């Protein structure tokens, strides 16, 4: 009788430990569904995972990355992590470094910086007052210009299209 009680206790302990994770995910899923820190279609980052939310259920949240892979995140992981909801942005930062050879004269460099600034300020994609073109450093083979501006979109797909247009 004692061994049966001990076995039943061990089975009960095993089941309760296994159910603990499920209960934690279920409760976290309920919190996510009620609090709504993100919705299906939103672009989020959780830890190393970034992508579009494609499904939210009581156990997990599915996120599709740019490379089309789908990450399944347990809701307890999501609810205990810092979630960056990029969809809540009203703009996105366009930024790159442009290397200019050292044999470029100062007047040429200043003209290039003025031309880049004027081009970005004239673009319908940018917030004019956010445009920045500065000499930011010196590389092994070039002077480095930091070129940055906020673009008038929060949508990742639209941002990538705008970025492509500006880069061309």
Predicted regions and their residues:
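Membrane-contacting alpha-helices and adjoining membrane-interface segments
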Residues: 1-34, 66-93
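Structured, soluble regulatory/oligomerization domains located on the cytosolic or IMS-facing side
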Residues: 46, 60-168
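Short beta-strand-centered aromatic/proline hotspots
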Residues: 50-56
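Short, glycine/acidic-rich beta->alpha junctions
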Residues: 36, 45, 55
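A structural micro-motif recognizing beta-strand termini
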Residues: 33-36, 101
């Amino acid at each position: 009788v004692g061994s049966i009680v001990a076995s039943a206790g061990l089975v009960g302990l095993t089941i309760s430990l296994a159910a603990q994770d499920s209960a934690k995910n279920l409760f976290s899923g309920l919190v996510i569904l009620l609090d709504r820190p993100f919705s299906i279609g939103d672009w989020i980052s959780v830890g190393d995972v970034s992508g579009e939310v494609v499904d939210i259920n009581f156990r997990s949240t599915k996120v599709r990355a740019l490379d089309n892979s789908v990450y399944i995140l347990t809701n307890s992981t999501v609810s205990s992590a810092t979630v960056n909801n990029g969809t809540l942005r009203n703009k996105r930062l366009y930024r790159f470094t442009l290397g200019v050879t050292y044999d470029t004269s100062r007047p040429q460099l200043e003209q290039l910086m003025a031309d880049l600034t004027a081009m970005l300020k004239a673009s319908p994609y940018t917030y004019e007052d956010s445009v920045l073109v500065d000499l930011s450093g010196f590389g092994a083979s070039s002077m480095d210009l930091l070129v940055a501006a906020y673009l008038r979109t929060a949508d990742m797909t639209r941002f990538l299209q705008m970025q492509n247009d500006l880069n061309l």
